[in-house]
Regions:
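Surface-exposed, acidic/Ser/Thr-rich flexible loop segments
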Residues: 111, 117-176, 180-187, 498-513
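A surface-exposed beta-strand-loop module
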Residues: 83-146, 203, 533-539
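N-terminal, polar/Ser/Thr-rich
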Residues: 22, 27-61, 94-96, 146-150, ...
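Hydrophobic helix-coil surface modules that form long, contiguous segments used
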Residues: 62, 153-159, 166-326, 355-358, ...
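Solvent-exposed beta-hairpin/edge-strand motifs
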Residues: 74-99, 510-512, 516-518
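Hydrophobic alpha-helical and helix-loop surface patches within well-folded domains
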Residues: 86, 96, 211, 240-503, ...
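Ligand-binding face of N-terminal immunoglobulin V-set domains in extracellular IgSF glycoproteins
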Residues: 61-81
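Long, ordered, helix-rich scaffold segments
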Residues: 379, 386, 491-493, 501, ...
Length: 883
């Protein structure tokens, strides 16, 4: 599953909207539920399930038979069920049928069937008749609405199959499924397997769609969808591929077909195990809280993560859609074909898919420089993991609450980065063989993390098990402090790194991890650092750099002389990915008060002419954070903005206007510089942005898309009522999700108080889908100009706000309050949410307070140094900013 917030934050670098990163931390339910695993004495083997949904009444009936294997005689059977009404339950075993009494435990989300006599050991069949509702909660079997009709769709991961049909809803209880859907004439149905037959009835206005038997799989991967879907077809390696949508958006499906075809062929070759099904459907849903979900053979998506106009889409949008498609398709092997034994190892599913998604996309579009995006994501994860409230990758998870909270930036980001580190150490081909061996040993079954790294250890004959256990079992980021190379060796010490200098690390915590040095032939020369090692052999050559490839999961600190040598040769001695790594390390040192903001800004100036968009994006991200979180006065902010204009203005000018011959990198670089200069209030850029934005609105095909969308964002942040009205109309009428959601987000970016008020009112008006409302409220909290107004609105209109929050989105809103940077702000946030509880937000509130405290501390320590640096740059004098 790709969470909507995860996919956004994972590729945002140090994006402006830190609210998206917060939702990667913890935004999920905190309802207190008792931990209760199902007994292992009864195991399902096969489900026969017939559902009859009524899309107008938002309800359905179900007829279900479950073939089970009973390990020992018992007169009770326990399975998972919630929000299901049982009509009848019976069991047939040994030729005898018994009718059950049913007792429900809502807290444990279980149903217990009690029978008059013991069921003998061996095979038996449960027969269940039940009814349910098509809920509005975006989970289980739920209703999705468009302007013209309703759809009935599913989202089961992690523990919501039990909301749709009674089931043994744990990943280890794999079974096969025969699914039939009785639906209205004119509707279509999609499920995991191809259609076996489609017959009229029962009744004149219904038809029954029966699907072929599925492979053996876990409940959370089951899917069934009903509505008016239209599809574009393709075929690859003997597999029928379809991308489906509502009828008005089917023109936006061909890009997804092309990407899916490429990715399927790539994965068949990479894994050495062919995709096991005869078809693969990718379906865009109007209402869908996750970014996407890897249902076996029937992957579901948010519309923005699948549907795209290849002619008018920006590079970023094309990249995002391709990566999300590749992520979910990776799960068809890693998660669906082979599934974790229990949710404490969900990181192996999600981390692997996050790591794997980059490979086919990088091969498909080398010009997108995916490796630089990976490096930026790694940098973001290191910052996330350097907070005191982080967790180990593998953590205890028993209740639905605990399981839900496992789907965070650690399970996706850190797990992916650890795999990247190990692959860099072993080499790509050795690592690939280990992946193949792991999958081949556990086909259609369950496995543990130990199974995975044991396969890698056996394949490589290197200590992968020790490295993985070290990085997976303990929280936090290693800080490696290097001495100067001498005699072919370098002294190195390690300790846990925290962004807050007030937190003292546990000196006993150490890691076993590979450290790769740049060798004389420009390859990675790796050594394994263990807790007992204090010196490593290093190859000769200068400058000395200890993270060759930029793929190590650690922060680095160098002696002053070594650091100066690296910076002096940064363009020639380091690759773009390594430059991103160095920028991240230096910024982290600023956050931890081990370096000054002036040192970082000097490094930014050193890479200002870098031709790689990823490097410039990383550099400007640190600057933007300094502008927002360190600069404390209007004069300091104005001085920083003037510095950016003078430093990057000439670079932007040298790029010149867009050309059809521009590479994707050049387009992204131009847009990043344009955005930075717009944020810095460059008058010429603001005028240019307004002109481009209006042209782009009138005819999207007339403007280079990446620049057009950037211009629109700049114009909105400086915009008037006329532009607001244009964007609101697009958000309500466009059939292109990229334009529709892009315009919706920009409504929350306006800064004039009357337009901020309109955007806030609109967010709670009922005209914004629930999956989007929390983000619309969170965005204005991120900037100085609109924060206080947005916070007052949220407090004053809490009943309306709360009505828009879904089960999972409350934490996004609560977490966004971490943008405050004052004692007063912290007190207000704590006080308000102490009396206005949000069920999804306990962890998000902790992270919010942590961010506020971190900002207060960062500003207190670094603001004087920023002022001194601005003075030395002649940007500020006597409290007055220089133009």
């Amino acid at each position: 599953m790709k969470l909507g917030c995860i996919s956004s934050c994972a590729r945002s670098g140090r994006a402006r909207f830190t609210v998206l990163l917060l939702c990667c931390l913890a935004v999920l339910p905190t309802t207190k539920l008792l931990g209760q695993r199902l007994p292992s004495t009864v195991r399902p083997e096969h489900y026969s399930l017939t559902l009859t949904p009524d899309l107008k009444a938002a309800a359905y009936t179900g007829v279900e038979s479950i073939d089970i294997n009973v390990a020992e005689p018992a007169n009770t059977i326990v399975l998972n069920s919630i929000e299901i009404e049982f009509q009848s339950v019976s069991v047939t075993a040994g030729g005898k049928k018994q009718v059950a009494t049913v007792s429900l435990d809502k807290e444990k989300q279980q149903a217990t069937f009690t029978f008059p006599e013991k069921i003998p050991a061996g095979k038996a069949r449960l027969d269940i008749n039940f009814t349910g509702i098509l809920n509005n909660e975006l989970r289980g079997f739920y209703l999705s609405r468009t302007g013209r009709r309703n759809y009935a769709v599913t989202q089961f991961e992690p523990t919501d199959a039990r909301r749709a049909f009674p089931s043994f809803d744990e990943p280890a209880f794999k079974a096969t499924y025969d699914i039939s859907l009785v639906i209205d004439t004119g509707d279509t149905a999609v499920s995991n397997s191809p259609i076996a037959n489609d017959t009229p009835g029962p009744g004149a206005d219904r038809h029954t769609v029966k699907f072929l038997t599925t492979p053996k799989m876990s409940t959370y991967l089951v899917a069934f969808l009903v509505g008016d879907f239209k599809c574009t077809d393709g075929e690859q390696d003997g597999v029928a591929i379809r991308v489906c949508s509502t009828p008005d958006r089917v023109a936006l499906t061909p890009y997804g077909v092309d990407v899916a075809k490429y990715v399927l062929h790539y994965y068949n070759n990479y894994f050495g195990i062919p995709y096991p099904l005869k078809k693969l459907d990718l379906i865009a849903l109007p209402d869908f809280e996750a970014g996407a979900m890897e249902n076996f053979g029937a992957i579901t998506y948010r519309e923005t993560d699948l549907l795209i106009d290849n002619k008018t889409a920006s590079v970023g949008a094309k990249k995002e859609v391709a990566l999300v498609i590749a992520h979910e398709m990776a799960h068809q092997w890693f998660g669906d074909l082979v599934t974790m034994q229990w949710w404490d190892n969900i990181w192996l599913n999600e981390g692997f898919a996050t790591w794997m998604e980059n490979k086919p996309v990088a091969a498909m579009r080398p010009e997108w420089n995916i490796d630089q995006d990976v490096a930026q994501n790694l940098d973001g994860t290191l910052n996330l993991d350097a907070q005191p409230t982080t967790r180990a990758i593998r953590a205890k998870a028993d209740t639905p609450e605990e399981i839900n909270q496992m789907f965070d930036g650690i399970a996706y980001g850190k797990a992916s980065d650890v795999l990247l580190t190990v692959e860099n150490y072993l080499g790509e081909e050795t690592f690939r063989k280990g992946v193949h061996n792991y999958l081949a040993a556990h086909l259609y079954s369950n496995a543990t993390a130990e199974d995975f790294w044991d396969a890698q250890t056996a394949t490589s004959r290197k200590p992968v098990d020790k490295i993985m256990e070290s990085l997976v079992a303990q929280p936090g980021v290693p800080l490696l402090t290097f001495g100067a190379p001498a005699g072919g060796k370098v002294q190195v010490s390690q300790q846990r790194f925290f962004l807050s200098p007030s937190i003292k690390p546990d000196q006993a915590r150490k890691w076993t991890l590979p450290v790769c040095f740049r060798s004389t032939d420009n390859s990675a020369d790796c050594r394994v650092l263990t807790p007992n090692v204090s010196a490593l052999a290093v190859p000769s050559g200068e400058p000395f750099f200890a993270n060759a490839g930029g793929k190590g999961y650690f922060r680095s600190s160098y002696p002053a002389g070594e650091y100066k040598a690296i910076v002096a040769n940064i363009e020639t001695a380091l690759t773009p990915v390594e430059r991103i790594s160095l920028l991240g390390d230096v910024w982290a040192q600023v956050r931890a008060n081990k370096s000054s903001i002036g040192n970082y800004l000097d490094l930014v100036a050193a890479v200002k002419d870098d031709s790689n968009a990823g490097v410039v994006s990383t550099a400007l991200g640190g600057y933007q954070t300094a502008y927002v979180r360190i600069a404390a006065t209007p004069e300091e902010k104005a001085a920083l903005a003037a510095w950016v204009r003078s430093t990057f203005g000439p670079v932007y000018a040298r790029l010149g206007p867009p050309s059809d011959s521009d590479s994707a990198n050049t387009r992204e670089l131009r847009a990043q510089l344009f955005a930075a200069l717009g944020e810095a209030k460059d008058p010429a850029i603001l005028d240019e942005a307004r002109q481009i934005a209006l042209k782009y609105i009138a005819d999207p095909g007339s403007v280079e898309p990446t620049l057009g969308q950037t211009a629109l964002a700049i114009a909105a942040r400086n915009g008037d009522e006329e532009l607001f009205n244009k964007l609101q109309k697009i958000s309500e009428t466009s059939a292109n999700p990229e334009f529709q959601i892009g315009a919706l987000r920009l409504l929350a970016e306006f800064k004039k108080p009357e337009l901020v008020g309109r955007a806030l009112d609109y967010a709670v008006s009922g005209k914004v889908r629930n999956q989007d409302a929390a983000i619309q409220l969170a965005i204005p909290l991120q900037t100085d100009e609109s924060r206080d107004q947005a916070w007052k609105f949220i407090q004053s209109n809490w009943p309306k706000v709360q009505a828009q929050l879904t089960t999972n989105s409350g934490g996004i809103l609560v977490g966004s309050t971490g943008a405050f940077c004052s004692e007063t702000g912290r007190q207000e946030v704590q006080q308000f949410f102490s009396t206005h509880k949000v069920a999804a937000a306990d962890q998000a509130l902790k992270h919010s307070i942590e961010r506020i405290n971190g900002c207060i501390e960062l500003r207190a320590l670094q603001e004087p140094q920023l002022k001194n640096w601005l003075t030395t740059q002649s940007r500020i004098s006597g409290g007055v900013a220089s133009r």
